[in-house]
């Protein structure tokens, strides 16, 4: 990105180049934004820049506000998309600008679920662990960002809840999906890690030679496998033995 204080000079230089055509201003102030003020502050700064460029004879046609509306992972209360658009439109009255938004996370995050099964329960003097068959290579956000993901048993059971750390089978201290969750669990239980639709598969890896998970699209009462699980043979397919 370009510092907004340097932007006028950069646009002026671009305007001098015959093979460049200036059409817009774009910004990206972050992701998982859960309040309107940061968006509106960025918008005001961009509008001031657009007005300054106009005095230099540079006409801006489109405005990309970038960033992304946040979603509710836990107790966040992000603004509604309609409120966001209304606030932006109010500030753009009388301006002939094509608007571009990047709402990816808000569209897909809460539409995705990572399903994982409890393989073992491990009780120690200090902590209880639920070892599941998913791992940080499948969903790295908790390990990478300390992200909080809601975990729900697919079939709830009665019993005394215990506080579990949900960990995967990878030999890494950071291999966890959730920590300190009050759950009633038994080996074999299926768990849903919710809000996994954004930055899930796209950030997954083959660490520890683990094939990436299959993806299933659910439409009403129908389910379709839209990406099959990777096989071990596929992971080795790109490798070659050294010559004899």
List the model feature ranges, each with a label:
Residues 1-4, 8, 40, 78, ...:
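Electropositive phosphate-/nucleotide-binding environments in soluble metabolic enzymes
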Residues 8, 31, 37, 73-77, ...:
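Residue-level recognition of conserved structural "scaffold" positions that shape functional pockets
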């Amino acid at each position: 990105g370009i510092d907004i204080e340097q932007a006028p000079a950069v646009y002026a230089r671009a305007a001098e180049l015959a093979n460049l055509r200036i059409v817009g201003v774009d910004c990206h102030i972050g992701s998982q934004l859960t309040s309107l003020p940061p968006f509106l502050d960025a918008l005001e700064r961009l509008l001031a820049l657009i007005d300054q460029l106009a005095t230099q004879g540079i006409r801006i046609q489109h405005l990309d506000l970038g960033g992304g509306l946040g979603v509710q992972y836990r107790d966040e209360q992000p603004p509604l998309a309609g409120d966001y658009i209304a606030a932006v439109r109010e500030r753009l009255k009388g301006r002939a600008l094509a608007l571009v938004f990047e709402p990816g996370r808000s569209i897909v995050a809460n539409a995705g679920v990572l399903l994982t099964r409890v393989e073992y329960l491990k009780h120690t003097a200090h902590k209880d662990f639920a070892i599941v068959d998913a791992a940080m290579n499948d969903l790295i956000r908790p390990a990478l960002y300390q992200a909080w993901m809601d975990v729900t048993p697919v079939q709830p059971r009665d019993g005394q809840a215990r506080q579990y750390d949900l960990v995967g089978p990878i030999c890494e201290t950071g291999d966890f999906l959730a920590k300190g969750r009050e759950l009633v669990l038994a080996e074999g239980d299926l768990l849903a890690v919710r809000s996994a639709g954004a930055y899930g598969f796209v950030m997954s890896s083959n660490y520890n030679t683990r094939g990436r998970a299959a993806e299933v699209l659910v439409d009403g009462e129908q389910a379709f496998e839209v990406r099959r699980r990777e096989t071990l043979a596929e992971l080795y397919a790109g490798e070659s033995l050294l010559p004899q």
